[in-house]
A protein has these predicted regions:
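Short boundary/linker motifs that mark transitions into or out of structured domains
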Residues: 1-44, 100-108, 115, 289, ...
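Intrinsically disordered, charged and Pro/Gly-enriched terminal/linker segments
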Residues: 38, 74-78, 108-333
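DNA-recognition element of transcription regulators
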Residues: 41-50, 75-95
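Amphipathic alpha-helical regulatory segments at dimerization interfaces
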Residues: 51, 68-71, 88-95, 129, ...
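Conserved RNAP core-binding helix
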Residues: 59-67, 83, 105, 203
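DNA-binding alpha-helical recognition surfaces that contact promoter or target DNA
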Residues: 67, 84, 91, 233, ...
């Protein structure tokens, strides 16, 4: 997925355990024997697996699956063909997942356990955590949101056909992906990464020409880089694309942003909670750790001095910490 940004995802996307199914791209099954993902062969197999994963833990009636695989005008042999596809897919899942396969119910089929994990679940969890962290720590929010986007390998449920279940879920996930992408750039702006965001949003607005939020973020990024005229030019470009593409004018939020930029509204330059605050917090924490380490070193020096001087005849009382500190102050002063 070209929109996935280059945020580090080692601590957010790794170490969480493998998911049973991957749907953020071609649908795949995690093979517990080999530790790899495998894909069903054939378009109907992928469409069947996609539909069952979308409704994992729920009974899917045979009629609905027939409609998913063959549309409004299924062949007369669709019921028998569905049974054959289920049998082949069941063998694949039993080999890959063990007992967590397809079960036959009175009215249809159920895939595995209700809690079957997918990469879509992981994506939504990371995205939610990123949004929840945005106000307090935009740097961390950007890491989480970047990790969520890095899970995408292509179009959701790619190759699973255009049946209503798979197509509807793919559309829902794509909207969540774009919303997460927009929130990622909000986090970057809050963290003070204006020039970087302005460059990348130029490309993203070209790829998604009717996403007003992306234009809004690009205008703010450019303005904070001191490029007011370019920011206003983005508004005109957005307006033209919206009129040509959808036949509508920009919404109130984008118009308000244009007016604010035109009149240099103070709110545009009021710094959001940015990276400097969090970097300062990190620096303070590192300083505290260093002070503790120095204190331990000082205690070790005191013990060594006392050990060295204890055997010397006529030696006075042991060196005390306060005295050593005073000596250090005298040297520095």
């Amino acid at each position: 997925m070209d929109d996935t940004m280059d945020e580090s995802v080692n601590e957010t996307a790794a170490g969480t355990g493998e998911t049973d199914f991957r749907v953020l791209g071609p649908v795949e099954v995690f093979d517990r024997r080999t530790g790899t993902y495998v894909a069903p062969s054939g378009a109907k197999q992928r469409a069947l697996l996609g539909a069952l994963v979308v409704r994992a833990g729920q009974v899917l009636p045979g009629e609905r699956l027939i409609h998913e695989l063959w549309g409004e005008r299924p062949p007369a042999s669709a019921a028998n063909a569905l049974q054959a596809h289920v049998a082949r897919l069941r063998r694949l899942l039993q080999q890959a997942l063990g007992e967590d396969g397809i079960s036959t119910q009175a009215t249809g089929y159920t895939l595995g356990r209700p809690g079957a994990r997918t990469d879509a679940h992981h994506f939504q969890e990371l995205s939610s955590r990123g949004r929840g962290t945005l106000a307090a720590n935009p740097v961390r929010a950007a890491e989480l949101l970047g990790g969520a986007l890095a899970l995408w390998r292509g179009t959701a449920l790619e190759g699973s056909g255009q049946g209503p279940l798979c197509a509807g879920e793919a559309e829902r996930l794509e909207e969540l992906r774009l919303t997460t992408l927009e929130t990622l750039y909000e986090a970057r702006l809050r963290a003070g990464r204006h020039a970087e965001a302005a460059r990348e949003l130029e490309r993203l607005t070209a790829r998604h020409p009717v996403r007003e939020r992306l234009y809004d973020l690009q205008m703010l990024a450019l303005y904070r880089c001191g490029r007011q005229a370019e920011a206003l030019g983005v508004y005109e470009r957005a307006r033209r694309r919206l009129v040509e593409g959808l036949g509508v004018e920009p919404g109130p939020a984008l118009r308000a942003r244009m007016e604010a930029i035109l009149h240099h509204a103070p709110s545009l330059t009021t710094p959001d909670p940015d990276a400097s605050l969090h970097e300062l917090g990190g620096a303070i924490a590192r300083l505290g750790t260093r002070i503790e380490a120095l204190a331990r070193e000082q205690q070790g020096l005191i013990r060594r001095l006392n050990s060295l001087t204890s055997g010397v005849t006529g030696q006075g009382p042991p060196v005390e910490r306060g005295h050593l500190l005073e000596q250090g102050a005298d040297v520095e002063g």
